[in-house]
Amino acid sequence: MSGFQVNRRQALALSLGSAAALAVPGWAWAAAAELDEAGVDALVRPFMAAFETPGIGVAIVRPNLPPFLKGYGVCTLGKAGAIDTHTRFGIASNSKSFTAASLAMLVEEKKIGWDDPVVKHLPEFRMYDPAVTQMMTVRDLLVHRSGLPLGAGDLLYFPTSTHVPADALKALPYLKPARGFRAGYDYDNILYIVAGVLIERVSGMSWQQFIATRLLAPLGMTDAVPTRAQLSGDNVAGRHARLGPPIRGMGPMKVIQPDEGPMFDAAAGINASVTDIAKWLQVQMAGGRLPDGKALWSRDQAQEMWKPETIVASSDGPTPENPTRPVTSTYALGWFVQDYRGVRMVSHSGGLSGQVTQTAMIPSRGIGVAVFSNTEDGVSGGIRNALLDALTGAPAFDWVASSVSRTRKAQESALAEVSGGVDTAPPGTPSLPLKAYAGRYSDPWYGDVVITETRGKLAIQFVPTAVFKSALEPWGPDAFRTRFPAGAGEDAVLTFEVKDGAVTRLTMKALSPLADFSYDFHHLDFTPVR
């Protein structure tokens, strides 16, 4: 097919929209299907062909059987290295369940309580609303009901910046809520970073040290590292994306470079192989117990982590086009919990620039599946659903055709949304001489940008984010656009407010309406530094 891919926002929506549902009348579970290597191959390879996927890793966990583990394709286009069962992928937001488990272990040790106020352990913690500061609990850090808007603060750490985890605490008082506290669901990463700071404060170990010594080592996750900074060797999955034209998500598949930094780790930092993640799924379904009987956490804590806390979405349930659409989707502690054909599914997705990973468990069947892809499209979600259906004997459904159809519809919608393209400047011109826009501007949660004027041209540098450096082009009245290097991230539109012949304010938004939510330029509010 011609290239089109979804971003992390869309991958998450596709995952929630197609991964789980209440069974409709007449559907019945067959006995767990015998799915051998040839059967898995027959499910995976058509997806790879349809989506032009360079590489896939698969793990399947079943009762009384060793895990099925296999790699497909190549680590990086243009290079010889093959994906195998020890190839490391960035598991991104699948890391959130590790942060939740770390907190559960500290709860077991009575060092914290789930319903302790965060300020009990982090006295410097502040939210925009002082009342919310006092009410926010350890549990609230994990369940996406803080009132913060989607992706708030993500520009602190994505792409790589000079910010450190403590800067999340400094930023939070300036991030305005989009809704009331505990009034609804909006996905965030920043509060998981705060959770990582809390783990360090209480345990005396950095989040990375805690994950490595308390989880990865006991589990024998020998390929895994808690942060990309610790990756070594060549057996690492590459990153691939379609960078346009006209927008990211379309055009030929290209190799891109990782752009996440260590500040992101407690929300999305772990790198692991499918061999590793099979062990994680096994200990999850065993209620925290290792094969030797040792408990990393109790069954009570296992149940606590899977208990729904926040309603994510609801619908009328399955349709012929989407037979696993959830009736209700919820978020627990580091996991989505929802229905899949009438039974509970515990799952998560994770997206980085150039990679998407999926994990899912059907605990009542003892079945777990992980699918890792080295592209940023939705192929891993379709493969996951196909594997789950095959493993549970669900009614036949053509997930390849469905995924291709959904992708084409998304492409059509995208093209309609950017009709005329994103490279057509709106009418209007700057009202001031270009030198008047030059200077240093500061945002209270992100930091500074510097705009320079040289020989009649403007340029911008985001001070904490080195890769965000670009010439500026006029883009309507008192507005300009960036052209960041290919693969560096989404471009932004800058709008200057002018009063009495001087700039008084600078705001931004992503150029493309389809930009991933982590490019939260719209949350920035700069003022000139005098």
Give residue spans per PLM region:
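N-terminal secretory signal peptides and thylakoid transit peptides that target proteins
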Residues: 2-19
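Boundary at the C-terminal end of the N-terminal hydrophobic targeting segment
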Residues: 28-32
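Short, conserved catalytic-motif segment at the N-terminal edge
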Residues: 33-91, 111-113, 120-121, 127-128, ...
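Short, surface-exposed loop or secondary-structure junction motifs
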Residues: 65, 69-77, 130-353, 358
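Peripheral terminal and inter-domain segments
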Residues: 312-313, 321, 343, 385-530
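Short, well-ordered beta-strand elements
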Residues: 347-348, 358-361, 365-374, 506-507
